[in-house]
Structures are given as structure tokens and as C-alpha cells.
């Protein structure tokens, strides 16, 4: 069986911490992972089999194995991955356990919180291990952020040297890291600056069309006399050519990182509407933090993306729509299908194109395990 799982690539910039870069890299894939640890619904029944067979999920099988007490030698025997890398991954699991000893964000000592950031833990991960909350965790995420800023634990901004450090180079090609301190560029409030959020890693149904939109946005901003600031991390895109904008942050498109950039740049506003699903998913979170979102209002984006709200709007306007229901169990699905018949379209809110979507022509498609299993 052959499955196409990836259509693009991503690139992370490493300073001195492998742990930081592997965690950032796993977040930047854009498949809903929060890092090496702290992910939802990643459990393997036959762990030895998963470790012995290279797949796109094996790195998470290694995380589970380390949490279950597998030794580095045993994992090496099954995976043949160099023990140096396995040792670094074990550092992440060990530090997760250390963070889990705290019950309040305020109880985390400054040195422990700083080391967590050096090891690539996001504010979201730290909140999950310390507070163990439910839901989308936006409030808890911001609690960690506030504590971190209170302690002066902020990411450094470094230039990427494109000539392999043969000589100093003053580029506008930037990334953020906790492995070192300080800024390689100067910051001041600029009312004539705009941040554009790119598309991140390409995936099936989300590709070069959003890069075209992003490039046009930054070019138009420059023509209008605005300083253009791009955040993106896909090396295949034109928008990550640092000649295209005034500043390029080659970094995560996460809520945490975008706020970090906004805190430093103090822009006139942020454009989320040209990068596809990842920026769209950030729109309401940024709006709730009083970040000026240019273009379509985040409230309108949410009204279009959220299927319940969109359906209610159609009803209010008297516009016909296909029969649909929000379902959480197979029994509910079967009951709905008995009413409307096949085929049925299955998809969540806040997705573009074919992501997380399926057309079912019989019950086997929605009751059987995925091809991965």
C-alpha cells in the first residue's frame, strides 16, 4: 500500500540545542503536534513493532517508549537510531517529568522555566504538564506566557548567516531561540509596518497558491510604503526569500511565536487572510489579545469557518443548505445516515480543501481503522 503523506518541506534553524530544534520542527510540520511530548491521541499498542518500522509517527513511538521506561540501548536495538540522538530525546522526556512535579505556574523557579524553553518546550506544553487542563488551553497558555515575561525569559532574535559564517553578514533573515540571549536587530514602534503570516508547510490541499497570496501581500505593503514583515518557515516558498520583505522571521507560525514577534515589532496590524488554514486558526486568538487584524474581521472568519455559526447565519438569511449535523459517536452517525442516505461528507470545522475530510459511500469508511493502522 502506498500513501502520499507529505507534499512539501520545512526547515528549522539550530543554534545550540538539539532538543529545542526537534520540538520546534515537530510543531512546524503542521499536523497538530505540540512537540516531542504532550501530544493528544498518540498511543501505540505494539510499541516494539512501531519502533522497528520507520514511519512518519515513529518519533512519537520513541517518546512513548522512553516514558514507559525503555532504555536507550533497547530503543537503539529496535530503531538503529544513533544513541546520541536518543539521549537528547530522553532529556526532553526527563524534563517533562520534572515540570509535572509543579502544580502552579507561579511555583516554577526561573531557572527551571528558562531551561524548559532552552529544551524547546512551548508555553502550551508547559501549561499542559503543570496545570493539566482540558479544552483548548488558551487561558493556561497565556498564564505561562505572563509568568515567563514577568521573569524576563524572552526569546533571542538572531540573524541567519547565509555564507556559512565566512564573514559577518547583516541580513534581514531572522529566527528566534532561547539557547542564547540578545537581539541582532534594533526594535522601535513603527506605525507603518505590517506583519504577514505565511502558510507554513505545504500539505495536500494547501500549497503554492497561498505562497502567491503571501508574496503579493508583502509586495503590496512595500509599494504602499509599509515595512513588510513575514513569518513563515517553508524553504520551498518565495515568501521565505528574505529579499522579498523588510524582515523575514523564519520560525514557527504558532500563537506563542506570533505574539513574540508582535511584541517586538509593534506593527500597524497583522494580515492572516493570505496564508491558508494555519493563520486563519490564529485569527480569533490574536483578536482576543487586541492584536489589530487587517482585512476580514476575525469574527467574520470565525462565522464562516465554524459550521454551527455558518449554518445559523444561512438560516437567518433564509438560504437553503444541505442537511448536516455535528456528531460525536458512531451511533449518532448511523442515525443521521439512515435519514439522509449515502454518500455523506465527513469533515470538521476550520479546515481547508481535503484536510481531515472524507466522502463515505458505506459504513466501512467511517467505522474501520485508518490505513495507517
What feature does the model see in each segment?
Residues 63, 67, 90, 94-97:
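Regular secondary-structure segments
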